[in-house]
């Protein structure tokens, strides 16, 4: 055997190492509770058992102390250790302050005890006794009696409807009421109700983000350029709105400017400014660095107003306000596409607004056209669900105006645009919904007056090959610079051709342009006659309701049947216009010479 002491083999025996309670202590404890004859063996066994249990309790308490990241063992740790071992904790030993123990000895004994403080009974008797708080009780009172609030202390003083309305629209008024004591709510008796205790509450002022001098100057220049008469400057301003990443602080003011501008110009029937404001909306939507979701409550009503408003211009029968409605419809579709979520249900709410106009027989025809245009831009499923079932109702609305029984030229023009819009958006959907053959009689029974024309359009769509279908886009508002004699004009109409046809031989694309809506200028028609091939012999008529301005001819058409010599000699109209200014015909009331086999004529509309 080695000289090293042997380690204990059991946990209980390991607990005997270190300090332990002696057998004499156990005898003293036994005598204190009335057990006088305790043998030495029993005292020894009890001392060992008590020492083991005390050490385990102290070890567990130390664990609680370490978990609590404390360096000092507390009474709470001992209590938690006792609870873990299913032992009822000791009570009466919890104190916030440190309790000093006093040492005393005498008669062969050493005692530790706490020294009690001396209490002066005279001081206690002289002080006023504290009132015992009352128990919590519930008491009922009448809040309203037959719709009238009684004037009792438990009820707040009633406020008049005028003061409630003022508080709702102007939150700052509450701070003024706190300063003025007489501005409290008036009871029903008419007497001023004064409060005994007046409390001053400081209301935090509404925070407004102030713009720097440079930002204010930029905002002023941008807004003036966007609604001004200088077209190149407007194009630069719109380009800045669509690409500048530092417009976050000015975005609330921009949206408010657009919303207030639409309100004012709709009342004044200023079509040009409404177009400019919608172009600002388009520029803001195209800016990838702006987050417009917080400002849709101002933009959506403005765009919706330009779509379904009853009148947008001074002369609805002549001015081309239909282009603005189409452009605003595309803006609304873009807003729904970008910001529609399962939370806000934006597209569902917009669709519900448009569909209400189709359900009401009192809706103005201009508003009806705007609703149809807005629904048609939201996709084929929307057309299938909301427009197709109401075709017969719409047909009955516009039939009297198209047959000449209506005396209003405005309604007649609106009915014609509604028919054109339906013939444009419905045939592709009807081709999918209905199977061939298509008969005019069936379409008339299902869709009324518009049935035969829709049947012809559906048959044309079925027979036309997919590669030869030319899609004519609605009137858009172009923000690109315009190369013409009138540089400050604004493009309203645009015909878009497929990419495969732009690589062919020259054709014609009409770009009517307006500068501002002038009240003293009648409408015009531009007739463009092509002479290159027999297939292009039919004249294209484009109506516009603005003052006469320049016509820019660009090269885009399908000329597969044109001869090689003619194609090589004619070239592109746009290239010819760049080579010589004589190749661009700017006409107002006279006939122009032919340019590359194309004759352009302009005449007054009757």
Swiss-Prot record:
UniProt keywords, alphabetically: Nucleus, Phosphoprotein, Transcription, Transcription regulation
The protein, known as: Transcription initiation factor TFIID subunit 6
InterPro entries recorded: ARM-type_fold (IPR016024), Histone-fold (IPR009072), TAF6 (IPR037796), TAF6_C (IPR011442), TAF6_C_sf (IPR046344), TAF_TATA-bd_Histone-like_dom (IPR004823)
GO BP, one annotated term: transcription by RNA polymerase II
Subcellular locations according to the entry: Nucleus
Residues recorded as bearing Phosphoserine in the entry: 546-547, 550
Subunit structure: Belongs to the TFIID complex which is composed of TATA binding protein (Tbp) and a number of TBP-associated factors (TAFs). Taf9 and Taf6 exist as a heterotetramer. Interacts with Taf1.
Annotated GO CC locations: nucleus; SAGA complex; SLIK (SAGA-like) complex; transcription factor TFIID complex
Protein task: TFIID is a multimeric protein complex that plays a central role in mediating promoter responses to various activators and repressors.
Protein family (similarity comment): Belongs to the TAF6 family.
Gene source species: Drosophila melanogaster (Fruit fly)
Location, primary (coarse class): nucleus
MF terms in GO: protein heterodimerization activity; RNA polymerase II general transcription initiation factor activity; transcription coactivator activity
């Amino acid at each position: 055997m080695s000289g090293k002491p042997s380690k204990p083999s059991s946990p209980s025996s390991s607990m005997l190492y270190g300090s332990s309670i002696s057998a004499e202590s156990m005898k003293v404890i036994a005598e204190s509770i009335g057990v006088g004859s305790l043998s030495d063996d029993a005292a020894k066994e009890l001392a060992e058992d008590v020492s083991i249990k005390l050490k385990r309790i102290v070890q567990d308490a130390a664990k609680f102390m370490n978990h609590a990241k404390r360096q000092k063992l507390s009474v709470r740790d001992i209590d938690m250790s006792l609870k873990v071992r299913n032992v009822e904790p000791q009570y009466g030993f919890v104190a916030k302050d440190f309790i000093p123990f006093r040492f005393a000895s005498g008669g062969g004994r050493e005692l530790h005890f706490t020294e009690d403080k001396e209490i002066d009974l005279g001081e206690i008797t002289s002080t006023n006794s504290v009132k015992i708080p009352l128990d919590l009780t519930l008491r009922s009172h009448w809040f309203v009696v037959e719709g009238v609030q009684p004037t009792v202390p438990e009820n707040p003083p009633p406020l008049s409807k005028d003061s409630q309305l003022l508080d709702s629209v102007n939150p700052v008024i509450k701070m003024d009421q706190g300063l003025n004591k007489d501005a409290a709510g008036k009871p029903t008796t008419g007497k001023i109700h004064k409060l005994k205790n007046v409390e001053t509450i400081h209301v935090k002022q509404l925070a407004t983000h102030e713009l720097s001098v440079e930002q204010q100057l930029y905002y002023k220049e941008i807004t003036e350029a966007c609604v001004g008469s200088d077209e190149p400057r407007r194009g630069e301003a719109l380009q800045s709105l669509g690409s500048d990443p530092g417009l976050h602080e000015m975005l609330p003011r921009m949206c408010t400017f657009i919303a207030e501008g639409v309100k004012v110009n709709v009342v004044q029937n200023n079509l040009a400014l409404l177009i400019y404001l919608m172009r600002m909306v388009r520029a803001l939507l195209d800016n990838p660095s702006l987050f417009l979701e917080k400002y849709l409550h101002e933009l959506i009503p403005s765009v919706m107003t330009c779509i379904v408003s009853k009148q947008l211009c001074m002369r609805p029968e002549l001015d081309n306000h239909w282009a603005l409605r189409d452009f605003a419809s595309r803006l609304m579709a873009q807003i729904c596409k970008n910001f529609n979520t399962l939370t806000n249900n934006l597209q569902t709410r917009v669709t519900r607004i448009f569909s209400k106009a189709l359900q009401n027989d009192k809706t103005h025809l201009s508003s009806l056209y705007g609703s149809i245009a807005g629904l048609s831009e939201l996709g084929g499923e929307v057309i299938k669900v909301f427009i197709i079932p109401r075709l017969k109702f719409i047909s009955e609305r516009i039939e009297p105006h198209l047959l000449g029984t209506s005396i209003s030229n405005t309604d007649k023009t609106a009915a014609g645009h509604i028919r054109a819009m339906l013939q444009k958006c419905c045939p592709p959907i009807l081709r999918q919904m209905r199977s061939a053959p298509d008969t005019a009689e069936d379409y008339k029974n299902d869709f009324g007056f518009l049935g035969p024309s829709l049947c012809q359009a559906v048959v044309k769509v079925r027979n036309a090959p997919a590669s030869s279908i030319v899609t004519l886009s609605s009137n858009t508002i172009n923000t690109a610079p315009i190369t013409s004699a009138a540089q400050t004009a604004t493009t309203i109409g645009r015909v878009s051709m497929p990419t495969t046809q732009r690589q062919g031989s020259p054709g014609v694309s009409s770009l009517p342009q307006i500068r501002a809506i002038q009240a003293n200028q009648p409408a015009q028609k531009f007739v463009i006659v092509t002479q290159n091939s027999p297939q292009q012999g039919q004249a294209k008529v484009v109506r516009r309701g603005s003052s006469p301005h320049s016509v820019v001819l660009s090269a885009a058409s399908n000329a597969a049947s044109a001869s090689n010599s003619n194609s090589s000699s004619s070239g592109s109209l746009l290239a010819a216009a760049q080579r010589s200014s004589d190749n661009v015909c700017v006409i107002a009331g006279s006939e122009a010479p032919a340019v590359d086999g194309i004759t352009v004529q302009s005449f007054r509309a009757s």
